[in-house]
């Protein structure tokens, strides 16, 4: 971890790296949908091509209408993004559309195992970091489609011992 301090790294980022580090991404095309800091960026060298989209920043993509062709990305990282999108179902459909067959989409949301059911209030709540919703365990139902496999990884951060869920979605053939 040369070049940055552990204080710059969040538990969710370390947990995601634990999952990603077990997979060979050589030559794969990555879409990274946030600025997750140096730990994730250190993984970029594992990929053949990397595109990063930062909301209202560098290469900002509208996830409900992604301006890319079908089957463009082999890997998509969507970390703490969906709760900020009004129409998250449309965003999920778009992510699946631009994901290649056999591609992998990794999704993380804040505390999905705390509540049984998602609480969606239909507006960005300023008391909840502008989130439209707090996902519950039922997020898996929202992610499931006929042509995808959803696997939940419960990962423990090795420093804080905080537990995080990383959803790994693999797009199967149509």
Predicted region positions:
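Conserved N-terminal segment of class I S-adenosyl-L-methionine
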Residues: 1-71, 158-174
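An acidic- and aromatic-residue-enriched active-site/binding cleft used to recognize and process polar
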Residues: 55, 78, 110-112
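Hydrophobic beta-strand segment of the Class I
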Residues: 73-77
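Short catalytic micro-motifs in class I SAM-dependent methyltransferases
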Residues: 79-84
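S-adenosyl-L-methionine-dependent methyltransferase catalytic module, highlighting the catalytic core
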Residues: 86-100, 104-174
